Amino acid sequence: SHADTPLLLTSIPDPWRHRLLVGAAADYFFGNRVSGAVAALAIGAVPIERKRVGRRSADMARGLVNDGWSILLYPEGGRSPDGWGQEFRGGAAFLAIRCNVPVVPIHLQGTGRILRKGRTLPRPSRTTITFGDPLVAAEGENARAFASRLQAAVAALGDEATSDWWQARRRAHAGTSPGLTGPDVGAWRRTWALGDRDRRSRRKRRRW
């Protein structure tokens, strides 16, 4: 959702927020000079190819990281059409490996209700943002394997958002965390399942 970035920029702690750039789809936000300038000024966007991260993007990211900046990236490469997550692409993992930096996984719950893809006006709703522990690529780990590990970490955070920390940790340890992409069923059943998940998130009360 286009609501993700504004919410994250107001939720990330100050020491990192003021040195944070947003990796934005080059083909969408930087299609012309005007839109690129607006994105850069409004949210601190920098262009990233979402289909295949090239050497130019990798070198730019490395230079920014070396200068002390953090980069917010969306590993799915685009917005969800129905509110469920999508499979992670390897671009974010590739950049993390090239830059030799840790990745902090973040899960956002409910932003699709605020501003779903195709909608122009936001509407009030409740969201949950869950931050995980930093992850570092293992020695010799390739981008695809690291991306899978990042996706599993975000799935565990999504489980925590609808249950509790202890149960989510147990399922993550057992490898049984609910997937981000939702059930492989018809469209109406996916919509119902997403609504049920959101209702559980709204009813949840943290134990600490």
Language model: regions and residue ranges:
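Catalytic core of membrane glycerolipid acyltransferases/transacylases, capturing the structured
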Residues: 1-52
